[in-house]
């Protein structure tokens, strides 16, 4: 009998498409049957035909849509739609759901039984989407990776030992047993390392009634990264509390701690840890404190050239005050530390009061303020003034007493740096006036104000040009004389970034206190008058600086609107 008569439909199509010769096709078909594999899987594993070629051919021949799995956000796959047993048995994967219709990825278009079984099991209308077989296998493994999978080799992470808080001995021993559970140790280590590698700033470990989830804040946005079994909740919490030196038996009150992770022989990263009792257990949030972020240099922060020169000039002044303002998470600490690093030489005495100290810097005297123990910002400032300081940094000006001491220091031969939670440079000045700071003292002590936000940077690998009508550009505030001289880009998403953005860049309003602004302050002018004068003197506000970043192709207009529009 002729070999070609023995060929299945797919084998015949491969021969007709010159992807296989007849002899190889017959042998592959027989080998797949012996190994109890689908022909598609055998061909890909044997490297006889690529997964992409098979998918494209099958899509054309069977009239089924093809989709590249790597272009999809695998975190959004409806994992619970199909049981793991059924997924692995039929080698299918749930991609997305629309109403009562479930779309599943398959690599073998002839596997009609898979679609029938999925439809029967879920009660949903099921539509097949062709995907590449090699990518399908990886995606299935990733989808059902459990809390203890893929963690081998992480036990050797060097976590500095910390004493456990004084708890009841029996409770302590029970909790310690939970905390030392090997799979939990590996899972926690993996989460910490993944957060560091992904450039995340915060980790959230969150218990709920029926689920436990872990989320990372990356580039300012929270996203879910893991859903370990709910049964691991108490053990994960115990492990994190042991590492942070917290009292494991205390589950009714918030606690604060710290973890130091050594990621190489020369580099370690600190995590600030906070626990919060919730309805379903303790939520734990960790802030990553990477000292290298404060040593990137001013050029890496995103200042426009004229803004950078204003900051550097202010740092060279022998006395006065530099204020950095913005909401929580806007990068104020990094801006301050960057300035302190520039000033950190052997002939300058620098002291800082912080709540808490986030980044340890050699050569700088850093103090943790703790009002409950009698050390608040104002008391730290008074102590600094008796320590022969050149530069003083106050983590935040929160009250009139701290503001008055800081201003007095700035007027008596010291450089003072601090932050406020205000929206703009103009609002910073009026906030201090409203606190009760005398207008004359404020006008003569403040040298520079920096208001800032952090915007996500477009991924350079996948950003695409975005056409925007002229009327829209004018409405958004782009300069009329610049329209037509620049291109705007929008996010796409690729393997490098996942969502179209990678990293963040600062958007700044840098205002020098000029004689004209001093007059308005001494007359106790409002924020509108101050902002108008700053614009007249050529200082870009946050909105204008953000539009410049969009015109330069660094970020998108949508992102500028997100961080600068009230």
Swiss-Prot record:
Changing residue 74 to R: In strain: PAK. ATP binds at residues 326-333. It comes from the Bacteria. Changing residue 414 to A: Loss of twitching motility. Zn(2+) binds at residues 459, 462, 494, 497. InterPro entries: ATPase_typ4_pilus-assembl_PilB, P-loop_NTPase, T2SS/T4SS_dom, T2SS_E_N_sf, T2SS_GspE_N. Disruption phenotype: Mutants fail to make pili although synthesize wild-type levels of the pilin subunit PilA. GO terms for cellular component: cytoplasm; plasma membrane. CDD domains: PulE-GspE-like. Changing residue 358 to Q: Loss of twitching motility. Keywords: ATP-binding, Cytoplasm, Fimbrium biogenesis, Metal-binding, Nucleotide-binding, Protein transport, Transport, Zinc. GO terms for molecular function: ATP binding; ATP hydrolysis activity; metal ion binding. Its main location: cytoplasm. GO terms for biological process: cell motility; protein transport; type IV pilus assembly; type IV pilus-dependent motility. It is found in: Cytoplasm. PANTHER family: PROTEIN TRANSPORT PROTEIN HOFB HOMOLOG, TYPE II SECRETION SYSTEM PROTEIN GSPE-RELATED. Belongs to the GSP E family. The ATP-binding site is essential for assembly of pili. Homohexamer. Interacts with PilC. Interacts with FimX; this interaction positively regulates T4P assembly and twitching motility by promoting the activity of the PilB ATPase. ATPase component of the type IV pilus (T4P) that plays a role in surface and host cell adhesion, colonization, biofilm maturation, virulence, and twitching, a form of surface-associated motility facilitated by cycles of extension, adhesion, and retraction of T4P fibers. Acts as a molecular motor to provide the energy that is required for biogenesis of the pilus and the extrusion of substrates generated in the cytoplasm. PilB ATPase activity is also essential for T4P extension while antagonist PilT ATPase activity is required for T4P retraction. This is Type IV pilus assembly ATPase PilB. It comes from Pseudomonas aeruginosa (strain ATCC 15692 / DSM 22644 / CIP 104116 / JCM 14847 / LMG 12228 / 1C / PRS 101 / PAO1). The gene is pilB.
């Amino acid at each position: 009998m002729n070999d070609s008569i023995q060929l299945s439909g797919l084998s015949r199509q491969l021969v007709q498409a010159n992807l296989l010769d007849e002899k190889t096709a017959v042998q592959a078909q027989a080998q797949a049957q012996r190994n109890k594999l689908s022909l598609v899987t055998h061909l890909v594993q044997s490297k006889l035909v690529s997964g992409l070629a098979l998918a494209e051919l099958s899509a054309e021949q069977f009239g089924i849509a093809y989709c590249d799995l790597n272009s999809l956000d695998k975190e959004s796959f409806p994992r619970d739609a199909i049981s793991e047993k059924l997924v692995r048995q039929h080698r299918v994967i749930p991609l997305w759901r629309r109403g009562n219709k479930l779309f599943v990825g398959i690599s073998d278009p002839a596997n009609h039984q898979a679609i029938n079984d999925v439809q029967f099991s879920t009660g949903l209308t099921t539509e097949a989407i062709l995907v590449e077989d090699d990518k399908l296998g990886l995606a299935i493994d990733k989808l059902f990776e459990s809390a203890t999978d893929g963690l081998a080799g992480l036990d050797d992470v060097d976590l500095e030992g910390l004493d456990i808080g004084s708890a009841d001995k029996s409770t302590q021993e029970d909790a310690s047993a939970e905390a030392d559970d090997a799979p939990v140790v590996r899972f926690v280590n993996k989460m910490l390392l993944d957060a560091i590698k992904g450039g995340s700033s915060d980790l959230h470990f969150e218990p709920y009634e029926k689920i436990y989830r872990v989320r990372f804040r990356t580039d300012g946005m929270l996203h879910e990264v893991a859903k370990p079994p709910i049964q691991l909740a108490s053990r994960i919490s115990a492990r994190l509390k042991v590492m942070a030196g917290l009292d494991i038996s205390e589950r009714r009150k918030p606690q604060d701690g710290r973890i130091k992770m050594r990621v190489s022989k020369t580099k370690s990263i600190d995590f600030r840890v906070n626990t919060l009792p919730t309805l379903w257990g303790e939520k734990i949030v960790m802030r990553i404190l990477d000292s290298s972020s404060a040593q990137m240099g001013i050029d890496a922060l995103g200042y426009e050239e004229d803004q950078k020169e204003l900051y550097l000039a202010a740092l060279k002044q022998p006395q006065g005050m530099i204020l950095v303002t913005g909401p929580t998470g806007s990068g104020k600490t990094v801006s301050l530390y960057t300035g302190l690093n520039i000033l950190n030489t052997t002939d300058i005495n620098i002291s800082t009061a912080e709540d808490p100290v986030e980044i340890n810097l050699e050569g700088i005297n850093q103090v943790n303020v703790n009002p409950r123990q009698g050390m608040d910002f104002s008391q730290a400032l008074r102590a600094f003034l008796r320590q022969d300081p050149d530069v003083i940094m106050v983590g935040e000006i929160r009250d009139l007493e701290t503001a008055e001491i800081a201003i007095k220091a700035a007027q008596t031969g010291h450089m003072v740096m601090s932050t406020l939670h205000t929206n703009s440079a103009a609002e910073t000045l009026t906030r201090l006036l409203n606190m009760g700071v005398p207008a004359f003292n404020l006008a003569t002590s403040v040298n520079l104000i920096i208001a800032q936000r952090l915007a996500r940077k477009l991924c350079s690998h996948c950003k695409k040009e975005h056409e925007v009508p002229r009327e829209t550009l004018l409405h958004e505030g782009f300069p009329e004389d610049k329209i037509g001289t620049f291109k705007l880009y929008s996010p796409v998403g690729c393997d490098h970034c996942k969502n179209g953005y990678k990293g963040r860049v600062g958007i700044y309003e840098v205002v020098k206190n000029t004689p004209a602004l001093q007059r308005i302050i001494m007359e106790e002018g409002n924020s509108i008058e101050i902002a108008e004068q700053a614009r007249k003197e050529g200082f870009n506000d946050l909105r204008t600086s953000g539009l410049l970043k969009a015109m330069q192709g660094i970020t998108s207009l949508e992102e500028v609107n997100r961080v600068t529009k009230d």
